[in-house]
A protein has these predicted regions:
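Conserved sequence/active-site signature of Rossmann-fold short-chain dehydrogenase/reductase
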Residues: 83, 131-133, 170
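Conserved Rossmann-fold NAD(P)-dependent oxidoreductase catalytic core, especially the SDR/UDP-sugar
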Residues: 59-106
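Active-site Tyr-X1-5-Lys
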Residues: 99-126
Length: 233
């Protein structure tokens, strides 16, 4: 993301200074690993190649640039709730073994174990559910075009529910994990609101705010993903 994309005040000394590169282009940012307190990995990934590579690149660089007397780096890996599988009647938590992940996310469950099991970093895994809020969600891209056209078209099933978390609350979870990295290293955290949201309610609210004439549901084009984002009432 280019620097101009980050909103900030001219007198704000805490503005984020981005390094524009692919995450695996570690030569652009490996010098920072000698002194930073934490790495928060939020890179999107639909497969293990880049996600696993970034982690192992960081581990390799740490061995050469970080003093042996320095405190361990905290590495926070973003995974997802899909690793819990697609059960409609089992209750899961942070500590539930991921023995039956959804096939789409099976690789994530394996990678999680590498991160939390590392002896070279304080490895922490954060599993957000569907992220909402401003530009931090796919929800707008999915629903707004149809609302603009006059009728909201939703993804899922009538009466279904979404487990969501606002991006500000997710950011707070990252902050708390980093602040307590030396204590909670080796831990995994599911990040979700206490209550799920009814999809019908979300679509009805969008209709009211946009002036669209009602809502409907469309048949999913990728049934491998639909179980990951919806649950029956």
């Amino acid at each position: 993301m280019p620097p101009s994309s980050f909103p900030h005040r001219a007198d704000d000394d805490s503005v984020v200074t981005p390094i524009v590169c692919h995450p695996t282009d570690i030569d652009k940012w490996k010098h920072l690993l000698a002194t930073v307190e934490a790495v928060i990995d939020t890179a999107a990934a639909d497969g293990p190649e880049d996600a696993v590579r970034v982690f192992h690149l960081v581990i390799g660089v740490l061995k050469t640039v970080r003093p042996t007397y320095a405190a361990k780096l905290t590495y926070v890996k973003t995974s997802g709730a899909w690793v819990h599988g697609d059960s409609r009647d089992e209750i899961v938590s942070d500590t539930t073994p991921t023995a039956t992940p959804h096939p789409f996310a099976a690789w994530r469950a394996v990678h999680e174990r590498h991160v939390v099991g590392s002896t070279l970093v304080n490895g922490i895994v954060v599993r957000p559910v569907w992220v909402i809020g401003r530009s931090g969600s796919h929800l707008g891209n999915m629903l707004f075009p149809s609302a603009h056209a006059g009728k909201v078209v939703g993804l899922g099933i009538p009466g279904g529910r979404w487990s969501v978390i606002h991006q500000d609350d997710l950011a707070d979870a990252y902050l708390r994990a980093v602040e307590r990295g030396s204590i909670v290293g080796g831990s995994t955290f599911d990040i979700a609101n206490e209550f799920t949201e009814g999809i019908d309610d979300i679509l009805a609210t969008l209709c009211r705010l946009s002036g669209a004439e009602g809502f409907t549901y469309r048949e999913p084009t990728n049934r491998k993903r639909i179980p990951n984002v919806t649950t029956p009432a």
